[in-house]
């Protein structure tokens, strides 16, 4: 019987784009694991809620046990929205997080140069368009074409739910090129987002293949 595995957890420790795929939260604790994990969840939820339209691709959290400092790296396609005029928005965000955690927080903003090749951002874009009542097939095909034109080796997009307002939910998939999900040498980027439409939730999954790792990259 076939089993499903999360694409990111499956590739932990594998090199991607010259860097090792690592946990999105990087810290260690013998006793306060549950408390620190809950703190991470609060940080992520606050950032995603406050910067919902800023194209957040990834949030990395690092904690130093000795100093009690929290370092938050925000990867975004729209750094101007996150930083704000004269850094006002990022300063306000830092103060919010310091209030939330009662710790000193450092916020770093990193730009995603090619959002059309980032699976999470593509999934978010499709979900936003579906919430705006766009035709799902046209939206999926447009995103697929954009990814392939930008240099992807392969891409696959799947939408599941009451597509087109039908009574029974179903799934529809479009793909182009090669997307080998069982090959660890393949640099597969995965993204997921739920679109809250009037007909219910529609799940959007995106896989983008950036190519096979060479021996030099390993």
UniProtKB/Swiss-Prot annotation:
SMART domains: KH
One Gene Ontology biological process: translation
UniProt cross-references to Pfam families, sorted A to Z: KH_2, Ribosomal_S3_C
GO cellular component, one term: cytosolic small ribosomal subunit
Gene3D superfamilies for the chain: 3.30.300.20, Ribosomal protein S3, C-terminal domain
Key word Heme present: no
Transmembrane segment boundaries: none
InterPro entries associated with the record: KH_dom, KH_dom-like_a/b, KH_dom_type_2, KH_sf_prok-type, Ribosomal_S3_C_sf, Ribosomal_uS3_bac-typ, Ribosomal_uS3_C, Ribosomal_uS3_CS
Keyword tags: Ribonucleoprotein, Ribosomal protein, RNA-binding, rRNA-binding
The keyword Ribosomal protein is assigned to this record: yes
Record text on subunit structure and interactions: Part of the 30S ribosomal subunit. Forms a tight complex with proteins S10 and S14.
Family: Belongs to the universal ribosomal protein uS3 family.
Protein's UniProt name: Small ribosomal subunit protein uS3
Naturally occurring in which organism (per UniProt): Rubrobacter xylanophilus (strain DSM 9941 / JCM 11954 / NBRC 16129 / PRD-1)
